[in-house]
Amino acid sequence: MVSLRILITGASGFLGGHVIAAVRAAGHVACTTARRSGEAAVDLTGPGMVDAVVQALRPDVVLHLAAMARLADCEREPARATAVNALVPQRFAERFGARLVSLSTDLVFDGRWAPYSALAPVAPLSAYGQSKAEGEERVRANGGRVVRLPLLFGPDAEGRGASAALRTAIERRQVSALFTNEYRTPLHAADAAAQLVALVVEPEGPLLLHLAGPERVSRYEFGLRFARRHGLDAKWLQPTECMDALRPRDVSLVAAWPAARDFEAMLADC
């Protein structure tokens, strides 16, 4: 097997740590960028920064994880969201074509026609979703590949991700309000990372696909099942309804292939 240099942008994020581990487990070399840490700690929106990073790290392929993902931040700064979520991935696609896998989100959909296949038309409700949808178009127009991801969970030392944040709140006896009317197809971050690495090293794959967990669940059901699996007190989970017009109600995805493990096994691995 040929060992590749895989550039991972946004490596300091929740998914980034899992991807680095998956890259190394597969026998490849991880070279990283992040806003706050990494081999190249950079703001990729800066003039010429994508080219500078590529020149410095000389990757064979790219996994582009970096994003502006907080919905409120994107609503406040839509131009910044477009720069981060659309223009930066476009520049990587111009350089790498099919040797780029750029991540997108289930929030490019409006939640009215789930479950969504990769061929379903996008209809984002938020500035975040709009910027990611634009990024998808720009990447694909330049021969790059796009992978849409659902809600991710799994262990994290900094308490990030759906399950780690819940565990921290319950252990601190803090109430977590969880939506009963918002549905996703949650996927363990380690499973997502392994699939992403397998995709990026095979540049002949499809230009657009979905990764997703094996079950459609509400945020509240996710919390209950996670708490039960780990013996945590579910009284700190408060069921509530989402009333935010910018949040789609059901963005469950049809995965490109079946999940490697069932949902309970994923929950146990947190």
Q: What are these model-predicted stretches?
A:
Residues D233-Q238, D244-C270:
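C-terminal amphipathic/interface module of NAD(P)-dependent oxidoreductases
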Residues R172, A193-Q195, E202-A245:
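Mid/C-terminal beta-alpha module of Rossmann-like enzyme folds, strongest
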Residues C31-M49:
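Adenosine-cofactor binding site in Rossmann-like domains, unifying the SAM/SAH pocket
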Residues R76-V101, E136:
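NAD(P)-cofactor binding segment of oxidoreductase domains
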Residues L44-V84:
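NAD(P)H-binding glycine-rich loop region in Rossmannoid oxidoreductase-like domains
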Residues Q90-A123:
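Conserved Rossmann-fold NAD(P)-dependent oxidoreductase catalytic core, especially the SDR/UDP-sugar
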Residues L4-A25:
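N-terminal Rossmann NAD(P)H-binding glycine-rich loop of SDR-like oxidoreductase domains
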Residues E137-R184, D191:
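NAD(P)-dependent short-chain dehydrogenase/reductase
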